[in-house]
Amino acid sequence: MMSEGGRIPLWIVATVAGMGVIVIVGLFFYGAYAGLGSSL
């Protein structure tokens, strides 16, 4: 599974992308929830 020719391994790209998506979605929901709570 070490057949990358100087490129970034796909599993690292997938892991970083997945964590980025989780962080963005989490921040989005947290911002929406905090905005909803403060507007009430």
UniProtKB/Swiss-Prot annotation:
Record InterPro entries: PSII_PsbJ, PSII_PsbJ_sf
Alphabetic keyword roster: Acetylation, Membrane, Photosynthesis, Photosystem II, Reaction center, Thylakoid, Transmembrane, Transmembrane helix
Compartment(s) of residence: Cellular thylakoid membrane
Disruption phenotype: No change in growth rate or oxygen evolution under standard growth conditions (50 umol photons/m(2)/s and 45 degrees Celsius). Dimeric PSII less stable upon isolation, accumulates a PSII assembly intermediate (PSII-I) in which assembly factors Psb27, Psb28 and Psb34 associate with PSII; the complex is lacking PsbY, the CaMn(4)O(5) cluster, and O(2)-evolving complex subunits PsbO, PsbU and PsbV. Only the D1 protein translated from the psbA2 or psbA3 gene is found in PSII.
Cytoplasmic topological domain residue ranges: 2-11
Entry note: cofactor: PSII binds multiple chlorophylls, carotenoids and specific lipids.
Annotated TM spans: 12-26
Gene3D superfamilies in UniProt: 6.10.250.2070
Single Gene Ontology BP annotation: photosynthesis
GO cellular component assignments: photosystem II reaction center; plasma membrane-derived thylakoid membrane
SUPFAM superfamilies: Photosystem II reaction center protein J, PsbJ
Membrane topology term: Single-pass membrane protein
Keyword Secreted: no
Segments on the Lumenal face: 27-40
Positions of post-translational N-acetylmethionine modification: M2
Known role: One of the components of the core complex of photosystem II (PSII). PSII is a light-driven water:plastoquinone oxidoreductase that uses light energy to abstract electrons from H(2)O, generating O(2) and a proton gradient subsequently used for ATP formation. It consists of a core antenna complex that captures photons, and an electron transfer chain that converts photonic excitation into a charge separation. May play a regulatory role in PSII biogenesis.
Family to which this protein belongs: Belongs to the PsbJ family.
Subunit organization: PSII is composed of 1 copy each of membrane proteins PsbA, PsbB, PsbC, PsbD, PsbE, PsbF, PsbH, PsbI, PsbJ, PsbK, PsbL, PsbM, PsbT, PsbX, PsbY, PsbZ, Psb30/Ycf12, peripheral proteins PsbO, CyanoQ (PsbQ), PsbU, PsbV and a large number of cofactors. It forms dimeric complexes.
NCBIfam families: PRK02565.1
Protein name as it appears in the record: Photosystem II reaction center protein J
Organism: Thermosynechococcus vestitus (strain NIES-2133 / IAM M-273 / BP-1)
Organism phylogeny: Bacteria, Bacillati, Cyanobacteriota, Cyanophyceae, Acaryochloridales
Gene that encodes the chain: psbJ
